[in-house]
Amino acid sequence: MNDSLSINQKPVIRCESVYKIFGTNANKLLEKASGPISAEEFQKAGCIIGVNDASFEIHKGEMLVVMGLSGSGKSTLLRCISRLTDPTSGEIFIDGENLLEMNSKQLIELRRNKMGMVFQSFALLPHKTVLENIAFPLIIKGLPTEESIKKAMEMVDLVGLKGRENYFPRELSGGQQQRVGIARSLAVEPDIWFLDEPFSALDPLIRKEMQDEFLRLQASLHKTIMFVTHDFDEALRLADRIAIMKDGIIEQLDTPDNIVLNPATEYVKKFTEDVPREKVLKIESIMDKYDQSLAGSNTVSKDAIIETVAESILDSKENLTVIDVNNDNKPIGILQPKKVITVLFGK
């Protein structure tokens, strides 16, 4: 979890009661809507739902992963937030500005200067080299060619493609092509990064490698990110918070730990049942409030994944003191070894 996030921050992205409905009777449906519209009402109206009353915020430096199966509305929601498609109803604000009130010129400027986008299809220009593909949006933006190439070379280094800058897309692997796509989207130094299933076309080993690369980039760049995936394990691995969608509705929006420990609906619970909790949960999610009288002499970081410290926890004959290593090792909680066993094994 990004510790810099604060509920007191003004959100970078704010979404209020967003609907995307396909069909000629969409406006009639919305006349009576005060919340999610039922499947029966959609069927009667002959409409198809894309997004059904979505409201949420994304704060600066946060990675919100929108997860759902095919047809859940996750990609439609991203397209509405980036205004690649217009929502049927609702409000969307980017840094306090109403996205839906912007004209075409303002939208182009916003996308050129504030937004980066990466999609499942690499969409590279086949007749241009890696360097030329990355420099392309900078040249379109109006930067001199020499400056664009210099910046593109920095991006080549950033994503680990040094030595391949003069290759053509056909000479690269799928993972390398997606690195070019990522570099191209970062070249304009966007504040907001939209990624729609960027790794789903890659084989499992390359996918894991790209997830590692993505986390490395985010640790240094601190972008505000909306990331779409159908893979719950990927969502757990990458997200600060996860929004799980079904039939256009956000079923639950919470931290990965809270979703695993406290699924809000039966639908969400199905995703969490087979999750190896020890590989996902952080100590902070299962600790008790700090009480000096119960504190033990051994300490454990609040951000540690249970699996990485399980042996020392289970060998301990006393409680452990949970500390915040980013705040001078301040004690913030108590961890009972018995509670770890209960959380992991239900005993």
Question: Could you tell me what each predicted segment is?
Answer:
Residues 14, 31-40, 97-98, 139, ...:
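Conserved ABC ATPase "signature" region
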Residues 82:
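Helix-to-loop junction immediately C-terminal to a conserved catalytic motif
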Residues 90-98:
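Conserved ABC transporter NBD signature motif
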Residues 168-172, 176:
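Conserved ABC ATPase signature
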Residues 187-191:
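A short, proline-enriched helix->beta-strand linker immediately N-terminal to the Walker B motif
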Residues 247-248:
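Conserved ABC ATPase "signature" C-loop
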Residues 253-254, 262, 334:
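ABC ATPase "signature
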Residues 295-327, 331-347:
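The conserved cystathionine-beta-synthase
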